């Protein structure tokens, strides 16, 4: 059964109903207006510090769910929008009659806990938010992200940092294969892979010297083909497909925090 208070008035009423117990602590009840004033004046840094203390505590207490499934730490990168009342938060306007903030999140897939959350206005693009998270991604790890993060400068920065990424390839991405594709069938599905370079003008500014790999995967359950993009030359096609499935964990995380 859920316990707790839903409003400041409920908290205040609870304190006044426990005056006898409070007196033993040398404390008194606090009225609702005092609580409201304290909330409005209390700096956000207090809650930020408290959040990271709790995060560090649970990071060491929660047993990892991935075990030895992957040889490197796996993270998911994505964002979600939290709606706000535009009348109260005019600075958060992102549509004519709507307000909101965007949470750019790097999730640890082993613990299902966020490594870092960057808050911006909802107007901020996912790419810009992702670049603010880059310094928190450890070298030698794997980052899974959807194709909303198809950005050549982001690909280069991740590659230069020694971070492996797995994402969906955009349908209109200009590229040329470097090696003949390999097609194979296994119990989990049919797949093909080939090495490639991006050929678009914007891509040449950032990725002209980098070779990428495309994994084509047929999901037997849905009978759909998917094209995954990675900068790894070692991951197998099955591992790439399994890694992209891990991205679902961050969707579940967003669902939980919004409930």
Please report, for each region that a protein language model flagged, where it lies by residue.
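Single, function-defining residue in the core of a domain
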Residues: 1-10, 14, 39-42, 49-53, ...
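Extended, structured, electrostatic nucleic-acid-contact surfaces
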Residues: 16-25
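Extracellular beta-strand-rich solenoid/capping regions of secreted or surface-exposed proteins
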Residues: 92-94
């Amino acid at each position: 059964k859920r316990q707790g208070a839903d409003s400041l008035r409920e908290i205040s009423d609870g304190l006044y109903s426990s005056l006898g117990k409070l007196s033993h602590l040398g404390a008194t009840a606090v009225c609702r207006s005092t609580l409201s004033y304290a909330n409005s004046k209390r700096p956000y840094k207090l809650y930020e510090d408290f959040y990271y203390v709790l995060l560090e505590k649970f990071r060491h207490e929660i047993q990892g769910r991935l075990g030895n499934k992957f040889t490197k730490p796996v993270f998911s990168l994505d964002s979600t929008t939290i709606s706000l009342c535009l009348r109260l938060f005019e600075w958060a306007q992102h549509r004519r009659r709507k307000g909101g903030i965007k949470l750019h999140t790097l999730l640890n897939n082993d613990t299902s806990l966020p490594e870092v959350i960057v808050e911006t206005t909802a107007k901020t693009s996912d790419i810009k938010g992702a670049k603010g998270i880059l310094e928190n991604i450890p070298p030698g790890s794997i980052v899974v992200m959807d194709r909303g993060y198809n950005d050549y400068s982001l690909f280069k920065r991740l590659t230069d940092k020694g971070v492996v990424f797995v994402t969906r390839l955009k349908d209109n991405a200009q590229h040329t294969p470097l090696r003949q594709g390999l097609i194979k069938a296994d119990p989990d599905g049919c797949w093909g892979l080939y090495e490639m370079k991006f050929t678009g003008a914007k891509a040449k500014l950032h990725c002209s010297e980098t070779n990428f790999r495309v994994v084509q995967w047929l999901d037997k359950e849905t009978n759909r083909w998917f094209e995954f993009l990675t900068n790894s030359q070692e991951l197998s096609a099955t591992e790439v497909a399994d890694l992209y499935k891990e991205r679902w964990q961050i969707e579940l995380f967003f669902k939980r925090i919004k409930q």
